[in-house]
Amino acid sequence: MSAPHFRVAEPSDAEALAAFMTRTFRETYSTDHFGICRPADVEHYIAAHFGPEIQRAELVDPALRTILAEVGGELAGYGQVRFGSESPVVPGSRPVEVARFYVDRPWHGRGVAAALMQQCLSAAGDADRIWLGVYEHNVRARAFYAKCGFVPVGRSTFRMGDDVQDDWIMAFNPT
């Protein structure tokens, strides 16, 4: 495997990114989600959050930075950081949220995710707290985030269509 290459996504990436987001989200929540998520809820969430126009708007939003991981010119994953995103359970005057983080299955366990997370943490700049939400039953993701230095600090709810799920809030102290 060649080493991953990282870059900040640009508006010209919107269509490819939207397709990648749709596919990886659908695979994660339709297949790996223990049969809990109804397909209609997954599709509703995808339509509301991952379309090309939505991505174009997000890619020019100064409060967001989307980092792409590419291997051999192929999109292998992405991470999105949201500046100034507060959580009631994460104290800090300069919080940054890792709002989205997905790596395509063929790249799981091959170092792409760890390197991408380092890029996200670096992109957080002078944040005094970095946080994320992760589905409580996604044991693999929770273990990965813990390995990266995130610790559970609370809980929140996540709505996907009509489905209300419990998420863990995990935080990273960059100092």
Regions from the PLM with identified roles:
Residues 74-76, 106, 110, 130, ...:
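Generic detector of intrinsically disordered, low-complexity, polar/charged segments
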Residues 12, 16, 139-140:
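Short alpha-helical
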Residues 2-5:
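Extreme N-terminal starter segment of soluble prokaryotic enzymes
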Residues 8-12, 19-108, 114-123, 173-175:
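Acetyl-CoA-dependent GNAT
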Residues 92-99, 128-175:
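C-terminal "cap" of GNAT-fold acetyltransferases
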Residues 15-18, 82, 133, 161-162:
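Glycine-centered flexibility motif
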